[in-house]
Amino acid sequence: MVLRYSYVFKQPVNYSNIELNEIKNIKDEKVRQNSIFISYLNGLYNSLNVLEMVSISGSLPSKLIQSIFKIILSNYDYNAIGKHFKTESILIGESLFKWPSPRIQQFDQFFFQDYLYSSPENYKGSLVGVNEYSMVWTLGIILYQCLTGELPFPTYPKIVNFITSSSQNVEIPPQFYKPENSLLIQLITCCLFKNPAQRISWNEIVNHSFFKN
């Protein structure tokens, strides 16, 4: 049983017991949209443990990554993901001491400490809270890790170097530029632009060609 606090519900919620049919019956539109997004992220962590698979195998084939994320996306209403959501209290994070997989965490306790998955703008203090831009960045980091078996910025100095450099997007190692990886690399690149306004939106992600093949 996973208990997390959410400002959406103003009380502890057992996200693992939130079923899609229950979500569809929620009358408050904003709460319903947030619930779907929370369940989407929770499914990534609790059902698939993607990064545990990466840690065991080193990296994952593009087709397997596609299949994994298709399964997650197919369980939820595409039109609801990313609409009007404001999830200031949650994020995908990684405990550096206990868990190898991404988890939904309380924003105020974990976000700024989680340098592995935090978006560049949060180091500059230009954005407060978790928004669509930072969530897209985090998803891009997870996809990058699935493809390469490594984090793009495994240490804090490397993140700082990227933030202060003239580079506008994260570079993927050349050995992964293969025809079967082309759409995945395109998606990762669109998620990991330094400028948040240039990043792909959630609606564009779920409709991306990578998930359509």
From Swiss-Prot:
Protein kinase domain boundaries: 1-211
Source taxon at top rank: Eukaryota
PROSITE patterns xref list: PROTEIN_KINASE_DOM
SUPFAM superfamilies, alphabetized: Protein kinase-like (PK-like)
InterPro entries named in the record: Atg1-like, Kinase-like_dom_sf, Prot_kinase_dom
One Gene Ontology molecular-function label: ATP binding
Pfam family, one: Pkinase
SMART domains reported for this sequence: S_TKc (SM00220)
GO biological process, one term: regulation of autophagy
PANTHER family: SERINE/THREONINE-PROTEIN KINASE UNC-51-RELATED
Domain notes: The protein kinase domain is predicted to be catalytically inactive.
Stated family: Belongs to the protein kinase superfamily. Ser/Thr protein kinase family.
Protein name (Swiss-Prot/TrEMBL): Probable inactive serine/threonine-protein kinase DDB_G0280559
